[in-house]
Structures are given as C-alpha cells and as structure tokens.
Amino acid sequence: KWKKEITEIAKLNNPKKILDVATGTADIAINLSSIKNCRIYGIDISERMIKIAKQKVESQNLNKNISLEIGDAENLNFSNNFFDILTIGFGIRNFIDLDKGLKESYRVLKKSGYIIILETSLPKKKFIKVIYLIFSRIFIPIIGKLFSNNPKAYKYLQESTEKFYSVNDVVKKLSHTGFREIETRSKLLGASTIYVAKK
C-alpha cells in the first residue's frame, strides 16, 4: 500500500527519470515502473540485494524500464541535476552519515525535483508510543525468532528505529540540506512516516 502511495506521489510530477536509493530487492522500483515513459534506476550497497533485485526484475520482463547497480547513497555515481524524483524506502535509518546522504540526494535531483522518503518512526502520542515500544521490544524479537531465518534483522529494526532521529529532526535535516515544501504523512499511527520535499 505504501509503495503504491509513493508511486502515486511520484506520478503527479510526470517524471522521466527516478532514482530509488537503497532499493533492496527492488519492490519500490518495480512499483514505480508502472509510470509511463519513465526510466527507473535502483541502487543498493548490498551486492546480494542487487542480485535478487535483478532476478525479480528479469522475471517480470522489466529490464527495459529498470536499471539496477551496486551504489552508495552517500557517494552517488550520477551527475548533478539528473533525476526528477528520488525515492528511499526504509533506507535513511541505515545511512552512516544522514547529512551527507541527503546532500547527495539533493545534488542529483533536478531543480524542482522531489525526494520521497518512507521510514520507520516513533509515534508522537505518548500513549501510542508506550504501546509501540512495548510491542517492538518484546514482540518483534519473538516474531523474528519464530518466523524468520534472520532474527537479528528484527532486533536491529527495533533498536535502530528507537535510536533514529525523530520526525521533526528529519524535517529539520531536509530543510537544512536545502529542501523546501516539506510534507510528512504519518502511517500506522506514527510507526512509519512518508516525507515529501522539493528541491
């Protein structure tokens, strides 16, 4: 649902070139490929993720629409003012230097281009936040152990979400980078947030 929302936001701006940063297994990139006359570029620092992503893209015959390569969000291998839209789904939490990553995103976007970020966040309302923290600290690790081959990933999700910047802090960082018209959309009672900002 959120991936479709990202695509709908992107579609409003009639993009010709979109970069999906931290593309993972290309779920967002594949969704974005439904936009007509638009080329999708996906990068991820993980060679394993890119390999899986390429297999998925190939199996859906989307090679003509989507280009995938290994790449670092904090050192993008693209020229200035190249993309109309830049998307990042559950990726900025893993940036080593968020400021540097946002500056790189800003650099490769065309003037009046948009950045669309989807990221986990802590709910703002105290009551919901307490319930969320109890759930994430107790149940997420249990779910990870019971249903996943990689329970450490679930534990990391919980810990990294708690340590990550607040929604207000991310907005400030976007503004400090130079982005304007910053909008936030709260999802799952604040457990995830979509950020939309214009260069």
Stretches found by the model and what they are:
Residues 175-199:
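Core SAM-dependent methyltransferase catalytic element
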Residues 84-97:
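A short SAM/SAH-binding and catalytic strip from SAM-dependent methyltransferases
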Residues 99-111:
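A short glycine-rich, Lys/Arg-flanked "PGG" loop and its adjoining helix->strand segment in the class I
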Residues 74-86:
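A short acidic, Gly/Pro-enriched loop at the edge of an enzyme's catalytic core
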Residues 17-75:
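Class I SAM-dependent methyltransferase SAM/SAH-binding core
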